[in-house]
């Protein structure tokens, strides 16, 4: 089978990362063909993300989801997979069987597409009474045991709380203030952020540029003793949360 995977924006967030894993194992385990489509109309694509996809898959830029019907016949697509909030919108095809992966709580009246699934067991139980099945993210980390402590001049006895995710995903103002108060009182604590928009200046609140490099991301997680999160929207199954969890 030929399966298309549609990504709105090629960025460093969980949707692009998880879609890569689904497309990869769709070929490796299920022996299907994966084709990647992304919306050229979005403004914040990361070149390194597009490059990584192109090393493994055929990648096509389209002018919105509306162009998918054209490629469905041209490339003989059996299905098109897309992650989104879950509400009815224009990201569904009338000609290609569309697989909807819902990330957020929705009413059952929002069901659409050929198949509709939730991203987590919690989402399925809490908001659909298990009427809608769930498929969680594939959580995979590189095996390296190296960390960034020496490079970042973090002392061995310091406790490191870390967070990585979308640039705007650590947006609770009162948490920002709490972190500043904490580092003033505790010199043995530091906070480390990957791809998070900088919200303060302090030598023990460190902000690192985002990366799609799996080795670097694992080094970042290895540097941390625990994850800290401060997203106003919350998560139903955050990929970053899963990555920290399997680290132990």
Identify the residue ranges that each predicted region occupies.
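Conserved catalytic-core segment of nucleotide-activated headgroup transferases in glycan assembly
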Residues: 137-203, 207-214
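Conserved alpha-helical elements of sugar-nucleotide-dependent glycosyltransferases
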Residues: 11-22, 171-178, 236
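Short alpha-helical segment that forms part of, or immediately flanks, the ligand-binding pocket
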Residues: 218, 241-246
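Acidic donor-binding loop of glycosyltransferase active sites
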Residues: 77, 219-236
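Extended catalytic core of nucleotide-activated donor transferases of GT-like folds
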Residues: 5, 45-124
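Donor nucleotide-sugar binding/catalytic pocket of nucleotide-sugar-dependent glycosyltransferases
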Residues: 113-144
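N-terminal strand-loop element at the rim of the active site
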Residues: 7-13, 20-67, 197
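Acidic, amphipathic alpha-helical patches
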Residues: 68, 145, 214-220
């Amino acid at each position: 089978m030929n399966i298309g995977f549609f990504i709105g924006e090629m960025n460093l967030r969980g949707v692009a990362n998880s879609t890569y894993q689904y497309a990869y194992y769709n070929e490796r385990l299920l022996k299907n063909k994966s084709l990647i489509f992304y919306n050229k109309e979005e403004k914040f694509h990361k070149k390194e993300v597009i490059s990584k996809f192109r090393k493994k898959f055929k990648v096509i830029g389209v002018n919105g989801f509306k162009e998918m019907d054209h490629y469905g016949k041209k490339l003989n697509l059996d299905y098109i997979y897309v992650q989104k909030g879950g509400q009815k919108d224009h990201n569904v095809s009338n000609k290609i069987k569309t697989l909807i992966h819902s990330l957020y709580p929705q009413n059952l009246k929002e069901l659409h597409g050929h198949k509709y699934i939730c991203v987590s067991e919690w989402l399925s139980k809490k908001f659909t009474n298990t009427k809608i099945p769930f498929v969680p993210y594939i959580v995979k980390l590189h095996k390296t045991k190296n960390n960034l402590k020496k490079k970042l001049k973090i002392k061995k006895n310091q406790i490191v709380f870390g967070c990585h995710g979308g640039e705007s995903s650590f947006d609770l103002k009162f948490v920002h203030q709490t972190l500043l108060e904490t580092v003033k009182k505790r010199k043995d604590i530091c906070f480390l952020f990957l791809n998070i928009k900088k919200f303060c200046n302090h030598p023990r609140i460190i902000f690192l540029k985002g990366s799609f490099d799996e080795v670097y991301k694992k080094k970042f997680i290895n540097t941390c003793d625990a994850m800290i999160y401060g997203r106003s929207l919350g998560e139903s199954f955050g990929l970053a949360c899963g990555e920290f969890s399997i680290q132990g």
